[in-house]
């Protein structure tokens, strides 16, 4: 769906568990540390639900080999710029699983894993520097592993279902954010198809993003 650029404050790294040459690497490069305590205390994002034949589950450390292989495929390496080796992916997944900022997910169809997603609190993420974030705004990044499935209608089919589940599971969330690279026409078309509001293009440290918000439906009483 959208790329996930490396930026923001460094996360804590245990020197005993990392190669000295890798110690300066930020484990969760988009996570902010300069946030209010009330935002920092919000627990990790909810797990969305999808009806069969699709499913979502929380990623495990054992998925690191699979996710690393996916993210080193050319179409995802270009979009995400997270073409890391397995050890770094294991740390990236572990940091998310141990924290409350972002939740890594694996998407499947008929029992076959085919997508990697990250559902994160936007107020804890670098994008909150570029719009007026509410504490329970959520953001979503998604990657379809098989290039043959890209542009085959999976995004338009599944995005509304995932977002509807997010709103149902966490009613305090009133919008879901997307921040594709401004050149990512596929992701931008999907945002527009889903009914997102365009919040402009913004220059970050290493790229220019197009910011979108998908608002929760309102109920007329």
Curated annotation (Swiss-Prot):
InterPro entries: Acyl_CoA_acyltransferase, Acyltransferase_MbtK/IucB-like. Its EC number is 2.3.1.-. GO terms for biological process: siderophore biosynthetic process. It holds the Pfam family Acetyltransf_8. The active site is at 179 (proton acceptor). Substrate binds at residue 141. Keywords: Acyltransferase, Transferase. This is Lysine N-acyltransferase MbtK. It comes from Mycolicibacterium paratuberculosis (strain ATCC BAA-968 / K-10).
């Amino acid at each position: 769906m959208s790329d996930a650029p490396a930026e923001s404050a460094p996360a804590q790294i245990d020197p005993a568990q990392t190669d000295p040459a890798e110690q300066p690497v930020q484990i969760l490069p988009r996570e902010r540390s300069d946030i209010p305590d009330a935002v920092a205390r919000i627990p990790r994002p909810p797990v969305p639900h999808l009806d069969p034949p699709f499913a979502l589950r929380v990623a495990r450390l054992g998925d690191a080999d699979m996710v690393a292989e996916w993210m080193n495929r050319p179409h995802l390496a270009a979009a995400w710029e997270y073409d890391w080796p397995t050890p770094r992916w294991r740390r990236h997944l572990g940091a998310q699983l141990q924290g409350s900022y972002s939740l890594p997910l694996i998407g499947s169809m008929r029992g076959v894993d085919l997508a990697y997603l990250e559902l994160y609190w936007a107020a804890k993420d670098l994008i909150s520097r570029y719009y007026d974030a509410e504490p329970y705004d959520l953001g979503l990044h998604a990657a379809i592993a098989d290039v043959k499935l890209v542009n085959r209608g999976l995004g338009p089919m599944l995005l509304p279902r995932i977002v509807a589940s997010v709103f149902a599971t966490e009613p305090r969330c009133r919008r879901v954010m997307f921040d594709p690279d401004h050149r990512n026409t596929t992701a931008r078309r999907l945002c527009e198809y889903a009914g997102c509001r365009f919040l402009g293009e913004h220059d970050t440290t290493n790229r220019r993003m197009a910011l979108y918000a998908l608002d929760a439906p309102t109920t007329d009483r």
